[in-house]
UniProtKB/Swiss-Prot annotation:
Phylogenetic placement of the source organism: Bacteria, Pseudomonadati, Thermodesulfobacteriota, Desulfuromonadia, Desulfuromonadales
GO cellular component annotations of the record: plasma membrane; proton-transporting ATP synthase complex
Family matches, as InterPro entries: ATP_synth_b/b'su_bac/chlpt, ATP_synthase_B_chain
Disulfide partners: none
Listed GO MF terms: proton-transporting ATP synthase activity, rotational mechanism; proton-transporting ATPase activity, rotational mechanism
Originating organism: Syntrophotalea carbinolica (strain DSM 2380 / NBRC 103641 / GraBd1)
Transmembrane residue ranges: 7-25
Protein name: ATP synthase subunit b 1
Membrane topology: Single-pass membrane protein
Function text: F(1)F(0) ATP synthase produces ATP from ADP in the presence of a proton or sodium gradient. F-type ATPases consist of two structural domains, F(1) containing the extramembraneous catalytic core and F(0) containing the membrane proton channel, linked together by a central stalk and a peripheral stalk. During catalysis, ATP synthesis in the catalytic domain of F(1) is coupled via a rotary mechanism of the central stalk subunits to proton translocation.
Length: 191
């Protein structure tokens, strides 16, 4: 508060006190009829002075208090607007994320289907390759078995042919031919 303002307040307070004292003195006039009007005017004057003094004294603080209150209300409203705007932005972001999530789910589903189809194709290719390998191995194994069976049949045929030839030779060779063949063999081996 400034010095001038303080002096004015003190001056108003003193004037109010004097006027109130004047009203108190004026109200002691006895029961005259015109005293009521005078009393009413003093009271009206007293009220006006009191109201004026209060207005003068309280105008500044009341104005500051109301101004501060108005400022707080304005700040609270601004803060509420900011909070509402922030909430609306978050809501819009959440809505966008939800929309994006639907799109991402659709994309993931499509990717998984494509990956699944690719995986199935790889598995089919591997199965075909394994089947081809098994067929190839079976063919080689069968060829080996057939070759082994041919050799065995050939050996058996040779053995049977030799037995048959031996039996025929035994039937056709006489003991003297046998002695002659042995002698020829010994001569050939001895040389």
């Amino acid at each position: 508060m400034s010095r001038h303002s303080r002096r004015m307040r003190i001056l108003c307070l003193c004037a109010t006190t004097l006027l109130m004292a004047g009203s108190a003195l004026a109200s002691e006039a006895g029961g005259h009829a015109d005293g009521q009007l005078k009393d009413f005017l003093y009271r009206l004057l007293d009220f006006g002075i009191t109201f004026g003094a209060l207005y003068f004294l309280l105008r500044g603080p009341l104005k500051r208090a109301l101004s501060a209150r108005r400022q707080r209300v304005a700040e609270a409203l601004e803060q509420a607007r900011q909070m509402q705007a922030s909430a609306e932005r978050r809501f819009a972001a959440c809505r966008q994320q939800l929309a994006d999530a639907d799109a991402q789910i659709a994309q993931l589903t499509a990717d998984l289907k494509a990956e699944s189809a690719l995986q199935c194709q790889r598995i089919e290719e591997q199965a075909r390759k394994m089947a081809d390998d098994i067929r190839s191995e079976a063919t080689r194994s069968a060829a080996r078995e057939i070759e082994a069976a041919r050799k065995q049949l050939h050996q058996e045929a040779v053995r049977l042919a030799m037995e048959l030839a031996e039996q025929r030779l035994k039937q056709q060779i006489a003991p003297q031919d046998q002695a002659r063949l042995v002698d020829e063999y010994l001569r050939k081996t001895g040389e």
